[in-house]
């Protein structure tokens, strides 16, 4: 599987949002998730990444966003949102099982597209009115 290039950690950027992050117009959990994925996509595009795919589903897993860095690196993005960090926050909610599912889906996508590019796994977390971008949040060998 692909391995990440050296990357510096991203920094959180405050973003205008309701105090608890959750858009009022979205009624369903799926609608809320889609709204956060759109916000994450726009943020990453402003940071210079290009959208490759959204909601890539393969047997055993799903990837919220697949982006591409200017240097060609594929970036598999998990978008997480929590109203508060009482139970560990958005980023902490990605356990070993979820990482394994992300890795399986990413590997299938990566192989289907030729497997030539470097890649990494990022998390965009929405917590307490802030968007936090965790670049290179985990690696393929961290899954278990």
From Swiss-Prot:
Q: Which InterPro entries match?
A: Restrct_endonuc-II-like, tRNA_endonuc-like_dom_sf, UPF0102_YraN-like
Q: Which GO terms describe its molecular function?
A: nucleic acid binding
UniProt lists compositionally biased (Basic and acidic residues) regions at 16-28
Region labeled Disordered — which residues?
1-28
What is stated as this protein's family in its record? Belongs to the UPF0102 family.
Q: Which NCBIfam families does this UniProt record tie to the protein?
A: PRK12497.1-3, YraN family protein
Under the heading HAMAP family, the entry gives:
UPF0102 (MF_00048)
What is this protein's record name?
A: UPF0102 protein BPSL3274
According to its UniProt entry, this protein's organism is Burkholderia pseudomallei (strain K96243)
């Amino acid at each position: 599987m692909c391995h990440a290039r050296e990357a510096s950690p991203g920094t959180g950027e405050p973003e205008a949002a309701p105090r608890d992050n959750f858009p009022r117009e979205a009624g369903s959990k799926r609608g809320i998730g889609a709204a956060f994925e759109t916000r994450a996509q726009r943020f990453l595009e402003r940071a210079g990444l290009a959208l490759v795919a959204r909601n890539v589903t393969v047997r055993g897993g799903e990837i919220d966003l697949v982006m591409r860095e200017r240097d060609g690196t594929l970036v598999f993005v998990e978008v997480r949102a929590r109203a508060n960090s009482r139970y560990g926050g958005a980023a902490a909610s990605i356990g070993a099982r979820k990482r394994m599912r992300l890795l399986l889906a990413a590997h299938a996508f990566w192989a289907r597209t030729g497997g030539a590019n470097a890649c990494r796994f990022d998390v965009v977390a929405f917590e307490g009115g802030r968007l936090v971008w965790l670049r290179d949040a985990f690696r393929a060998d961290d899954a278990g």
